[in-house]
Each structure stands twice: as structure tokens, then as C-alpha cells.
Amino acid sequence: MKEPNATHEKAQSFFEGLWKRGDPWELETSEFEQAKYADEISILAGRRYGRALEIGCGIGSFTRLLTGPCDSILALDISPTAIARAHERGLHAVEFREQNIMHFDLERERPWDLIVLNETIYYLGWLYSFFDVAWLATQLFDATATSGRLLMANTCGGLTNYLLRPPIIRTYHDLFVNVAYQTTAERTFRGVKNGVEIEALISVFSKLPA
């Protein structure tokens, strides 16, 4: 990984700047975001998850909902401000930790029954090389328990941000398939936020028994 310290500092500075302004994505107040979260939780229905790892938890907006199907959660975010605010929720069986996933020891803390990448992967692709993201995907697969799952949700339509273009989001999706995850469920969530029609691709990948 090239210049890990410089990249980490860039990432932390970027997200700190956003979270210090409040709720930059309106995760707590947007009807669109709340409906998308509910759709993500519903796609996980039908089983419980013993240990869950949430990557890029922010202020814990989605973490709160994960406490329903999950027995214990480790929620990571690179922003100290976000983690401090997440702690204020006082969620049971949740550990919020300031951590860059690219520096996290997945080998030491595995296995995970559920891994969550909620609107996170394209930021990693912006900050790091595709090789680095591919290596992370491989490590996540290895750290997933047999029959465990990975939930990935990404905005992929309706906005002009080049990070969110459907072909780019599909490339990340295919990356996780190529490291041996199997697509268990997938759907497109559609809604309107601030007058803009937006689509989000919600995917559940599974690590099937060998």
C-alpha cells in the first residue's frame, strides 16, 4: 500500500471535516436514508448474526438498526468525532472503535458472521488503489465465518458524483464475487432525496462451505 500514513491522514481529515459539520448525509433526518436503511435490514432477515463488523459506521445511524439481528457488533470509523458521537447512543453489545479498516487486523479478530459496508467501498476506492481494495476484499472473505454474509449498499444512480456511477459500483460488486463470495440476494432501492431521484444497489454476499 503506497504512503499509508499520508493516505490515512488525508482520509481522516476529509471525514473529520464532514462530521464536525453535523450530519452531512442527513442520515438521521432524511426519509430516503431511513427507508433505505429499513430495506437493508429487511434483506438480512431470517437469521441471527453472532458477531458483526461494520466498516465506516459514522455516528452509528445504521449500527442502531443492526442491534436487532446481531448479538454483538464492532463498529469502526476513521473519524474520532463520529466515534465520539456514536458512543453517546449507549448501544448495548456494540463496541465503537476509531479505526481505519485498511490498518485493521482482520486476521486477529476473525471470524465474523456479518460484515457491513454501507456506502463505504467507493470512498476506499477513491483513497486507495484498486489493488489495495482488492486485497481488502480478499481479507474480508477470509475473515468471514463459513455461511457468514457481507452486506454492501452503494448509491449508484441519480447523482453526478463520478464515484457513484453504476459501472464503477458494479466493478466493486464484481470484485467481491471474484474473491469467492456468492451473491445471495440483491435489489435496487429507489427513492427521492432533496428532490433528486436516487438509486442504491443493495447486495448480500455469502461465504458458502467449501
Descriptions of predicted regions:
Residues L114-F130:
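A short SAM/SAH-binding and catalytic strip from SAM-dependent methyltransferases
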Residues M1-R108, L127-F141, G148-A210:
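Class I (Rossmann-like) S-adenosyl-L-methionine-dependent methyltransferase catalytic domain
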Residues E107-I115:
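A short acidic, Gly/Pro-enriched loop at the edge of an enzyme's catalytic core
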